[in-house]
Each structure stands twice: as C-alpha cells, then as structure tokens.
C-alpha cells in the first residue's frame, strides 16, 4: 500500500481516501461468534492505529489530506484516528446517522427516519470530536447510499427547499463537508420500477431474499427503490440531451426520468438554483473562520422537528435552524437572537415560523 501511495504522490495527487480502513487489523486466533456477523472481531482491531502510523510514514503522506471510511466504528476510535498529533488520518467518514431509517437496524426494512436519534448522533460526534481534537468528514451521500433529497427530504413538492436545507444542515457544522456528484444539483433516486433495471449485486440478491420472505412484488420493488446502492450510481445528469449528456453510447444503467429538468446545464447560470446555493455555502466557509474553525453547541435536543445549533469563535456567532419536516413548525429563537442579521436562507423572505424544509442562518 505504501508503494501505491508513493506512486500517486509522485504524480501530484494531494489526498487519499481509504476504504473501510478500520478493518485492516484481524485477530490471529479465530473465534466462533454466536451473535451478529462477527464484525466485533475485525472492526477497529488492536493494530489499526499502529498500521496507519506505519502507512503514513512509509507512504510519505503525513500532512496530506487523508480520509478514512470507517465501518461500524466508535467515536473514541475516530478521535484517535484523526487527532492531529497522532499522524494517522485527517478525518473520518462514519455512517451511524445514515442508519436512523433502518427498522431494527436492518437496511432492507423500511421505517420513517428517527430524527431525534439523528440529532443525538450529530451532537455526540460533533461535541466529542471538538472536545478531543478529532475531525469529522460531513456527508449525506456517497456511492453506497440513496440520494439524500429522496431519503430525508422531498424529491417532488419541496425538492429545492429540502435539498438546500440538507446542504445547510451539514455545511455549517464543524468538520469538512463532502459533496457527492450531482448532490449540488439535487439529483434524486431514479425510482426504477423493474428489478431488471438494477445492476447492484446486493440489490439483486435482496430482491430474491425479500420475495422468499413472502413480500409482494410491489413491496419488494418499493424497498429496493429506496435502499439500492444504484440510487446514487446512475450517470451524472449534465444536460437535457439523450442520456443526460453523459455519453453518446449506451450507459451501463438507466437514468432518472427527471434528467431533462434536473441537470447541470439548467442550473449553471441560474442564481436561484440548488447549485448556486451550494456555491454560497462553499464561499461562506472560505470567508468566515467561525464556520471552518469555530466551536459548536446544539440546541433544542428534544425537538424532533428541528435541527438547531450555534457556531461561535469569540468574534462571530451563527445560529442555524433547519426544519426537518414537510410542514410548517414553530421557529424558536434563543434570547438575544430576535434582531440578528439573516445570513442565509432557502426561502426568499422571512417568516415567524419555519416553513416546510426551511433553513435559516442568523449572524450576530
């Protein structure tokens, strides 16, 4: 692995992502496991920290950007992986917040997202990393996850509002935000209706398993449509031409039917587009140290409808309010925030409530 790192470093590569890197330390003695899938034996093994230090030193990548994808990890281990003086990784991906809609922890069982659980996870990881010098990689989407706007928002009625709210929710947090291809356009799940449209081997296998569990064809396809890794693996939607401008040939998988409306060309010069909103988020993070380096405090932990937190650094304070629901909710303001300046929002005007999927960022 060190040879691979040196090879790409010599070509000018500035950073590396390590896939499920916390499973590289395996036990020397194999034990029987009568619970679960055995992951407790191979996840965050006792030599992972040692191996990472050796890899960073041998690969000559200390000081470069490195992000580790962590499987079933813990906060304590990720603090150790990312603490600056440990010379292991710059930041970690963890997936706990993306399991809040798993019924009984099972990916292929549907349920509504548990937003209180999600908020608690955000708070635990944000405050834990802050207290002990660790660093989070912030994300909703990747190549294995459904599209966030279809999963935690509305990809129809409130498509734009929910896509922008989800973006703001993590881009103002402490850590490094990641934007998955097409997320900045609000790309949705493709909503395939036939199993033949899928290429993902996991989805095809679970189609058979679910049918064997006596689920109907319609029930099975609904589950697959909401959970498949193919939801995020359809071609990038560049424009409204055939195949969304991705290729003049035949793509390996189909394209979402909404590509003529949701594509890069349609948003390139549109000042009120989702892409424009993302550009504003990136610009604010570059401009305002409180976003990239300030502290974070979470508010209203028992409110299942509202994600709210404060960022502060001694000079500037921000209040981030995100309505997680497809309905109007109350807009609570802490003492001293009534006359604060509106820095950003995904509605053109202001209101005394938070409208469906509304986000508001206040500054003082």
Can you say where each PLM-predicted feature lies in the sequence?
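Active-site and adjacent substrate-binding regions of carbohydrate-active enzymes
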Residues: 1-336, 341-364
